[in-house]
Amino acid sequence: MVQGCTSNAGKSYLCAALCRMLSDEGLRVAPFKAQNMSNNAGVTPPESSAPGLEMGRAQLVQARAARVVPDVRMNPVLLKPEADTSSQVVLLGRAAPELTALPWRERKPRLWPFVKGALHSLLDEFDVVVIEGAGSPAEVNLRPSDIVNMRVAREARAAVLLAADIDRGGAFAHLLGTWHCLMPEERALMRGFILNRFRGDASLLAPAPEWLEEQTGVPTLGVVPWLNVALPEEDGVAVEAPAAIIPSPSTGFVAIPRLPRVSNLDEFAPLGELARWVTSPQELAGARAVILPGSKSTAADLAWLRATGLAGAVTRLAVQGVPVLGICGGLQMLGQTLSDPQGVEGGSAASGGKVYGLGLLDLHTAFAADKTTRLSEVRDPETGLRLQGYEIHHGQTRSGPGVQTLVPGLLWRSGNVRGTYLHGLLENSAYLEHFLRWADLPVPACLDSLDARLDAIAAQVQAGLSWDRVRALL
């Protein structure tokens, strides 16, 4: 099990690497994370025993690394933030409104049996289960209701590796402090420390790892280098400094408004340094294209766009001929009207009245209680490309006479403005190339596939670990 001293310590990357490394040895491997809090979700594929169900993108990627079919048991609980103090609960791939309505501390006793059941079924079915923790196990206030860190480790009798992000500084204090906050029976499960995202000469770390082992009895089992390889992100922590897989051009970029309730932001990782997250009209200067991303609270984020002046600025760019792409919630914002007669979003449109969109596409969206979750593969008649992606939305959208429907219910166009419900478009390398050419941006000579990136990450992580000692923990 990989735990971290903090959020964004690199747990997801390390787990993906371990899944690929162990799969390379011929073992049947499954990833597992009891609970994710993220709006970066995907859906299980048709070959899954239960297709079309939601789970965290990190575990979807880890399943790919392990070369197994994704299964919602790998991420039994998914919390999708809707506001500062509320989250939608997705249990075993399906929205659970009865749990969403409960206070946080009352949910946990009801969730644990599902977590425990999913964990043990995977342990029975696979040779190895690579478990990812969440945040930090040292949050003393969360210990009584823990269902994702040390309670899972105890249940699985897992060997725990604790990772710290050394690039941020204070890694040895983080590791020692986390260890001190654990209960004695939890410390007994701690089998190694990992210094993650290191840049420079590892010999300069001496004698700190030896000192740390003297203090705790826990050895440092790896110094993993900074990995400049992009994987889909679990949450929004890394938005401020996205990993790059495409060189930054001297001029021009793709502007993406940093909506307060942005969802599925991981799908923009293929843009690398070409992506620039913006929060003001001034930051749009020089943009070659604009993408309006998905949102968990579309009407509220549309109001934010207007309050910041970005709505008007994006509209002006569209009128000037700059390519604009809206994805899911972004598609809905580009339309004429949004209505929420059932109060599905619980926000600005909850009264059932209409909210007016940017009017760049002649589309009208009504939110419905039933959620669409499915993988889709369609042919784009405009480009001739086969597009693969996934849908996760409550909106039902109808078109007016002023928009061209490219794929019914999925893809629309009006001049230089396009909208789609299909997440993951840019993860299709052929479409990414088309998009970059459309935006008059440079197309790199080679776009690495996800499997190639997973292989690269696994090789670098294995080189940084004392792999024989880690492997012996199984």
Swiss-Prot record:
Leader sequence residues: none
GO BP terms in the entry: cobalamin biosynthetic process
Domain GATase cobBQ-type: from-to ranges: 251-431
Gene3D superfamilies linked: 3.40.50.880, P-loop containing nucleotide triphosphate hydrolases
InterPro entries for this protein: Class_I_gatase-like (IPR029062), CobQ/CobB/MinD/ParA_Nub-bd_dom (IPR002586), CobQ_GATase1 (IPR033949), CobQ_N (IPR047045), CobQ_synth (IPR004459), GATase_3 (IPR011698), P-loop_NTPase (IPR027417)
Protein purpose: Catalyzes amidations at positions B, D, E, and G on adenosylcobyrinic A,C-diamide. NH(2) groups are provided by glutamine, and one molecule of ATP is hydrogenolyzed for each amidation.
Family classification: Belongs to the CobB/CobQ family. CobQ subfamily.
Name used for this protein in its record: Cobyric acid synthase
Species of origin: Deinococcus radiodurans (strain ATCC 13939 / DSM 20539 / JCM 16871 / CCUG 27074 / LMG 4051 / NBRC 15346 / NCIMB 9279 / VKM B-1422 / R1)
